């Protein structure tokens, strides 16, 4: 199987898991909850699972196919925040604390800014 197939299969699984986790969170917190509990929970769980997977792959040498399907695919489809968390942790582990802080803060600020820019562009188009 190709790398693309591993990622695609895993991504489909992760997206379905995210959909159902979001529905469960809405059912628990209610549709009018002020705090986005579903996304919060998905990001935290996805980051936890990414840590478990990264640690397991490092110990077992689980292989590229598992990394692609589970890490890039399933967890990438479940939440891209897990990859962000892993990359930040790797920068910290390498001793580049300042770069890790810059990456974390910059990613959040740039991401939210990009979202507002996209909304602004679409308001101008509409």
Curated annotation (Swiss-Prot):
It is a multi-pass membrane protein. It comes from the Bacteria. It catalyses: fluoride(in) = fluoride(out). Na(+) binds at residues 76, 79. Keywords: Cell inner membrane, Cell membrane, Ion channel, Ion transport, Membrane, Metal-binding, Sodium, Transmembrane, Transmembrane helix, Transport. It holds the Pfam family CRCB. It is found in: Cell inner membrane. GO terms for biological process: cellular detoxification of fluoride. The keyword Ion transport applies. The chain crosses the membrane at residues 1-21, 33-53, 72-92, 97-117. One of its GO terms (molecular function) is fluoride channel activity. Fluoride-specific ion channel. Important for reducing fluoride concentration in the cell, thus reducing its toxicity. PANTHER family: FLUORIDE EXPORT PROTEIN 1-RELATED. HAMAP family: FluC (MF_00454). Belongs to the fluoride channel Fluc/FEX (TC 1.A.43) family. This is Fluoride-specific ion channel FluC.
